């Protein structure tokens, strides 16, 4: 049974024994929620801040006892109409019913598929692709959304059309028929679909062992204490949003959330909720992608006529999901340090869906670590620290240290051999938080999830992992430096020009810093074959390139969204500044700089720049014509 200490005492985690996570047989989140329903039944479990009708929001609360009852009712209904192994898709708006839907699927012993209301803008194609891939027998939604969901699936044949259940219409009395599911540690709990931008999304199989393991890893990294509470606006269909909101089910205290749109429209809502300290609660924790820190710093600072703000109780905000910018963190600290925000509060982190979510983060007593390395050495797969003002200096943000009972090694993927600290290779992972494969994709699963590390170095980062352990290939470049993990970039996004490697985020950063005419965080760098460049490039004397139908050499393209108020500016000086900065900083010629309007660059469902989708739209001409349909991150209220 899970135990917490007295109020104010350190969070005691009985599942960590001798540095490894150990669970009793058949431990799962269902058992945790049922325990809290018994020992904290009259206490707040979840609060949804609903800003759809009131500017200041309406708090919609559910207690642990009621949460358990609703979960059992939905779980029982699913047990009545589905079979073990069936997929249950969640097409709910982000509210309490979404959480009840997800837990209801876990309570039923079926496989949850956290998705989103089809009314959300920008996601229709992805939603159809995921439903085709997982073939759910049932869809959970709400009474208000049910009609839209039925219209959305109407085009499917009757045989392929899932049953639609409105969870808020399921009587609580049905809970009396619920039976504890016969799920074990290896049973798949849910499918976490990746945020791929060009290929069909893959559903990572997360088991009933993977899920609590990763939740415990996050809580341990955050040094949770009795009374700590969570705050989030992240979408539940994204791995970071889902795992963050599930922390409450193990910690046993309350969690407050809002919709992504509520944050995007008024980021001060998130900041003020982080500062709120009701009753005897302890510290506050949260998570957000990098852009949120910049957005909050610009638009979330309280006005003079608003109540005072005290952020001294904010313990940790995981910063992940996209590359972490030192400038964004600096702006966030400068904006909120006057309100008591600790320098240790923001935690640059690393994670991915294949690991359930969490891999590493900055230790709680440390400020974010930013070092500078030589660009040429970096492009040659080596980490060599230099002074910040050195000519070739590139800032690198530490992703901290790997979580408890988890292993991350840097590998030469060609030889499956571990590399020493300071050398860049592919990050391979092992641990009980790693998913078991991709749903219905045996070959792809084997390539990603079933790799053997053929050789280890002395003082190996794999120490403690079995010799025959299976390792997950992340597709990310990284290295260890001074005992911290650093992420260099995605292998598939690497730009190779004239035989030299260039990390796209490095090129994007240089372009961003060369001009104020680009939206912060909305720049994409990629390469295309010379003979596939559009004719307009060859007509431009600045490109310095003549068309040759046999020239397949890779050429650099930069696409950037114009910042607000810059649409009337002459584009040529902006383009010239970008070209010059990259030529000087990287020694490479930019053959095309395309400036587009806000909202044009494709983004993945987790908000990252979709470089491959952007490249595809560039090649087919839709990006230049402005008729592309990028994925939109924010969801509606």
Curated annotation (Swiss-Prot):
Catalyzed chemical reaction(s): a long-chain fatty acid + holo-[ACP] + ATP = a long-chain fatty acyl-[ACP] + AMP + diphosphate
EC number: 6.2.1.20
Keywords assigned: ATP-binding, Fatty acid metabolism, Ligase, Lipid metabolism, Nucleotide-binding
Example GO molecular function: long-chain fatty acid [acyl-carrier-protein] ligase activity
UniProt keyword annotation of Cell division present: no
Recorded family membership: Belongs to the ATP-dependent AMP-binding enzyme family.
SUPFAM superfamilies, alphabetized: Acetyl-CoA synthetase-like (SSF56801)
Transmembrane segments: none
NCBIfam families (UniProt xref): FAAL_FadD32
InterPro entries the record matches: AMP-bd_C_sf (IPR045851), AMP-dep_synth/lig_dom (IPR000873), ANL_N_sf (IPR042099), FAAL/FAAC (IPR040097), FAAL_FadD32 (IPR047968)
Biological processes, Gene Ontology terms: fatty acid biosynthetic process
Name recorded for this polypeptide: Long-chain-fatty-acid--AMP ligase FadD32
Species: Mycobacterium bovis (strain ATCC BAA-935 / AF2122/97)
